[in-house]
Regions:
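Secretory targeting signatures
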Residues: 1-28
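M14 metallocarboxypeptidase catalytic domain recognition
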Residues: 19-436
């Protein structure tokens, strides 16, 4: 009788604890993971636009959920904000080098919030969208979305980060953690097309602005493709909201500034655009405008992927071939400004090294144009035969008089550097000048 009672008690205990047999008792899980459900249409995206901005913590937590989607190649904490909040980069596609990568960056300015909700909805659509809408797109492009660059600013309702820095003026000097992370993300995904999402105060009937890069240093193929893409977005907004609702971003004192996102990453080699929705509109309408423009970019690149891929590849190939006028920039490890110059170059992903041998080099100073030929073995240099050398020229010659926003230029640091006007034998060395 006792054996029967004990047996019943054990059976009841196992049943109540969720264990249904010996395998469960010994922690062997026989459950089958449910397949991921692709259940959302583009119409759901429009229907779910919020009427008020979403908290930064909710955006972060909800974005983590997309790691379960088979379409998400990587969901990376690419870095952290000044206050330690995770900065999330979501990637779709296997980064096939034969198709372009489209990259969206949301809300460098914390008080321009609509782009974050738009970026989240865009990420959700590609993570959960029905196959007939999403799969044909991801067969033609790779997609990356930096969902929220400045969560600290979003929490505070401020333009700058927790240090009060305007992140969209930090792309040259890279002093802020968020600025460094944006550069790291760009180098990681190597996009053909980059879109920087913002907001503006509004101007009468103008509810949306689009801007292509205007820095003359930009590779001509990249610049041309940027203007084609800009025109397509303007036409798409006009068709939906009416003629006169969208315009080019007006020229300002910073139109050519390399420290601004759209110019900076265009000089690095990516087709580039700026979006701005008008804060004079209802919040939901601002999110809709941002989302509509983002979809317009994606559709345009999907329609002609080779054109945008070729623009990026033209810039890359030029970089690999090098500059046939300035072959390198030479500078001394003993120069007090050199450690900061090396930090900036490295943070931008550029190789640095030293001159191999004592042969003379025909060169001129970047600012005074005074000649110099004697550079000893071990002289520091940054070679120009690498992808993005147009940005090297900007970093090594940028002066504070060129634009009001960049105050960490070689001239301001009193960096002496010489343009090598002939080829230089060199050795790449990531520890260059570390002992000085």
């Amino acid at each position: 009788m006792m054996k029967i009672v004990l047996s019943s008690i054990i059976s009841l205990t196992l049943s109540m604890s969720g264990c249904v047999g010996p395998s469960s008792f010994f922690d062997e899980d026989d459950s089958v993971e449910e397949p991921y459900v692709f259940d959302l249409t583009l119409e759901d995206m429009w229907n779910d636009i919020p009427i008020n901005q979403t908290n930064a913590s909710d955006i972060i937590n909800w974005t983590y959920e997309f790691s379960k989607s088979p379409r998400v190649t990587n969901l990376t904490e690419i870095g952290y904000s000044m206050n330690g909040q995770p900065l999330l980069l979501v990637e779709f596609g296997d980064y096939d080098p034969d198709i372009p990568t489209v990259y969206f960056v949301a809300a460098q300015h914390g008080n321009e919030p609509a782009s974050v909700d738009s970026a989240y909805l865009l990420t959700r659509h590609f993570a959960r969208g029905v196959p007939e809408e999403v799969d044909p797109i991801l067969e033609n492009i790779n997609l990356a979305i930096f969902v929220m660059v400045n969560p600290d600013g979003r929490d505070a309702g401020s333009r700058g980060n927790a240090n009060g820095t305007d992140l969209n003026r930090d792309h040259m000097k890279l002093l802020e953690p968020e600025g460094k992370v944006m550069q790291k993300a760009f180098q990681k995904i190597h996009p053909s097309v980059t879109v920087d999402m913002h907001e503006f105060g509004g101007a009468g009937s103008i509810i949306f602005q689009v801007a292509a890069p205007q820095n003359p240093t930009t590779h001509p193929d990249v610049l041309a493709a940027s203007y084609v893409l800009e025109t397509d977005v303007i036409e798409s907004i006009n068709e939906e909201w009416g003629f006169g609702s969208v315009t080019n971003y007006p020229p300002t004192t910073s139109s050519q500034d390399s420290s601004i996102h759209r110019n900076h990453f265009a000089v690095h080699g990516s087709v580039s655009l700026l979006f701005e929705s008008a804060v004079s509109e209802e919040y939901s309408e601002r999110v809709r405008l941002q989302s509509w423009a983002a979809i317009s970019v994606i559709e345009e690149v999907v329609d002609d992927p080779g054109y945008y891929l070729d623009a990026r590849q033209s810039s890359d190939e030029e970089g690999q071939e090098g500059n046939d006028i300035v072959h390198a920039y030479l500078f001394e490890c003993s120069d007090p400004a050199t450690p900061e110059t090396l930090r900036i170059l490295r943070d931008h992903g550029f190789n640095v090294g030293y001159k191999a041998g004592d042969e003379s080099v025909t060169s001129i100073h970047y600012e005074t144009f005074l000649p110099r030929t004697n550079f000893g073995n071990g002289t520091a240099l940054v070679p120009m035969d690498q992808i993005g050398w147009r940005m090297i020229s900007e970093l090594m010659e940028y002066t504070s008089t060129k634009d009001q926003h960049y105050t960490n230029s070689p001239k301001d640091r009193n960096q002496d550097a010489w343009r090598a006007l002939e080829p230089v034998d060199y050795i790449i060395d990531d520890t260059l000048c570390d002992s000085n």
